[in-house]
Structures are given as structure tokens and as C-alpha cells.
């Protein structure tokens, strides 16, 4: 048993990079999200320019960064760091979500809200079509 522990300790100390890989990404100026108003069943695709605030219903959405994996990487992935708040008249914005959203796994970091669903569909350049 001690030999097995020693082998695992050796591997953990001298080969830590074997457990993960750094994937190169490219910054994109626009995050593309899909928004659902559960009360009216309205679905809308919204383009969020990085650093700008966009309104959807009572929500304010800000994309702080949007990144895609390079085209030669498989599978392709889009990820965005989003900040979403609920705007209440005469009060401060109530934070609803702050964190990374991934286009390939929307349930991984979902926004919990009784009226709205927001999920990332991709990132894009101004001239590129939505992915």
C-alpha cells in the first residue's frame, strides 16, 4: 500500500501538467445570447458588445469578455464572462448572475430566474456570421 501511495505522490509532484491542457483562445468583440421571457414565450437573439450594457425586459446584460477556441481545436467552444442584473425602479440593480457561460454546455452555469432564461450561443466578430 505504501508503494502505491509513493507512486501516486511521485506522479502528482513531477507530472502535474498531464492532467490538463491549455487551449489557445481568441477574443471576440461580441457575445451572442438567446433570451427567453417565460411569461410571454418571447425568444430573442441578443448581441452584446463587450463592455456595453444591453436591456432585455427588466434585465441588464453586460459581457466582459467573449472567447472562442481556435478553428483547428475540436470541438470548437465559445465562452463569455457575463454579468446580469435585474433593474428595479428607484432601486439599485439586483445581481442575478455573474460568471462564465459556455455555448456547448448551457446548463453548466445556468442563470436562475423565475421570469427569464439567458444562455450563450456563441461569440462573433462584427463581420462574421453568428455561430
Where do the model's predicted regions map?
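Low-complexity, intrinsically disordered tandem-repeat tracts enriched in small/polar residues
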Residues: 9-13
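N-terminal signal peptide c-region/cleavage motif recognized by signal peptidases
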Residues: 14-18
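N- and C-terminal low-complexity/disordered segments
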Residues: 2-8, 19-131
Amino acid at each position: 500500500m505504501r508503494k502505491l501511495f509513493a507512486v501516486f505522490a511521485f506522479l502528482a509532484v513531477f507530472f502535474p501538467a498531464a492532467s490538463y491542457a491549455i487551449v489557445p483562445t481568441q477574443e471576440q468583440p461580441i457575445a451572442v445570447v438567446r433570451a427567453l421571457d417565460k411569461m410571454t414565450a418571447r425568444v430573442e437573439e441578443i448581441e452584446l458588445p463587450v463592455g456595453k450594457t444591453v436591456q432585455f425586459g427588466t434585465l441588464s446584460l453586460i459581457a466582459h469578455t467573449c472567447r472562442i477556441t481556435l478553428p483547428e481545436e475540436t470541438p470548437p467552444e465559445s465562452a463569455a464572462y457575463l454579468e446580469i442584473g435585474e433593474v428595479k425602479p428607484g432601486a439599485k440593480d439586483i445581481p442575478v448572475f455573474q460568471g462564465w457561460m459556455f455555448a456547448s454546455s448551457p446548463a453548466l452555469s445556468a442563470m436562475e430566474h423565475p421570469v427569464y432564461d439567458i444562455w450563450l450561443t456563441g461569440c462573433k466578430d462584427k463581420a462574421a456570421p453568428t455561430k
